[in-house]
Structures are given as C-alpha cells and as structure tokens.
Amino acid sequence: MTLDLDANKKDDKLLLTTIQQEYKILAEYKMIESEKLSGIYVIPSYANSLQWFGVFFGRQGFYTESVFRFTILLPDRFPDDKSLPTIIFQQDVIHPHVCPYTHGLDVSHAFPEWRCGEDHLWQLLKYLQTIFSDPLDSIRGIELDKLKDSEAAELLMTNKEEYVARVQKNIKESKEHIFDTPPTEDPHYIVFEKFQQDVHGPVLERIKAGRSKQTEPSAQQANGGHATGLSWVKEGEFKPLSIE
C-alpha cells in the first residue's frame, strides 16, 4: 500500500512538472507572436512540444529570397536547463555559424548558456535573423577555429563573389524542394502549396481589399477584444500544445 502511494505521488509530481513545462513553452510561443518577427515563422509540433518547425525567409543581404526550413529542438528540462536549444536546417546552408555536416546552427557566441527567465526563444530567432542579414558582422572578433564553418568564413572574407554564388546555389536547391511531400504527418508541419486561382484567388483579393480599405471591426473587436490569426491553441481553450 505504501509503495502504491509513493508511486502515485511520483506520477502526480511528474504530471505537474510536465504541465508547468508546457505552459512555460506556451508562454515562449506567445512572446514570439507578440514580437512579430518579420520573415521567420515557427510553430511547436503537435506531437511533441519540445520540437518546433520553422521557416526562415531572407529579406536582405546575401540571403535575400532564401526560404530555409529548420527545426528547433528544446532540451528535456527546458527552460530550466542551462543547455541551449538546437537549431538544425533541413538543407545545405553555407554560413560561418552553420555546421556543413550536421546543418546545426551554433548559437553559443550569443548564448553561452541558457538563463531561465532571461533568455527567450524570440531572442534566439532574432539572432538567427541578424547573422543572416549580415554574416560578415556576425563573425567579427571571433577566431576562425571557433566557427562551425571556418572555410565559409574565410571565403566570405576573401572572395565574396564565390560566397554569394554558393548562397545562391543553396537558395535555388531549397526552393526546388519547397513543395515536397512533408517528411512527417504532424499536422503542425509548415506546408507550402502552389498557387491555385480557384482556391487562393479569393483570399488574395480579400488581402488586397484589406490593404486599400479598412474593414469593419468584428463583434469581438467592438467589445474591446482583438482579432487573431490561426493558432495551434484553440480559441476559448486553455489546453496548450500536446497536453491531452
């Protein structure tokens, strides 16, 4: 009987810890939404809140017009663990901070360790944006042997034309696979579809109309609320992420 009680207490404690972690991760997602980062989109996996799907759209610099998919893997005890989240690109990406073999992004130069309550995922994504906007500036003051791809760094400093050509090759290859069948059945995986006039045309027209004319406020907005886009957390529910 005592053993059963102890086991139940352990199960309850584990459940409570899991729920607390889920809400902390939900808070991180809400912060990302509020920051409105341009050209970068992420969403937690439906099946596992420690795995996030993301897409980066280059808007300036050498990586303009790039569309790079990536995955974020959070440590098991995130955000209380000092271990850093892992960002892995799903294709070849030449960059001094990206390992050419694992496609992993080194964020340790900006985040030596994860500080719970001080470091947040939106800052991590902002760092990703910054180093792709200006890769040369991102390696200033860092020794070549401390970079994940020292050859890329050297090429960037000595032969920018060749570096840009390599970047363009990456961009071309990534776009060739943008409409590929998703590698997972997870419903939160970010999927792109080719434009279909009958499906997407009406939506495009509504977007254009919205730019030229202010739409009438919804009932929710009229009552002091605000409209939101599609979310993986259903409106009116408090169940976040993968809690069943």
Curated annotation (Swiss-Prot):
Lineage: Eukaryota, Metazoa, Ecdysozoa, Arthropoda, Hexapoda
Annotated spans, Disordered: 209-244
Protein family: Belongs to the ubiquitin-conjugating enzyme family. FTS subfamily.
Lineage: superkingdom: Eukaryota
Designated name of the protein: Protein crossbronx
Pfam families: UQ_con
Family matches, as InterPro entries: UBQ-conjugat_E2_core, UBQ-conjugating_enzyme/RWD
GO biological process per UniProt: defense response to bacterium; sperm individualization
Domain UBC core: 20-176
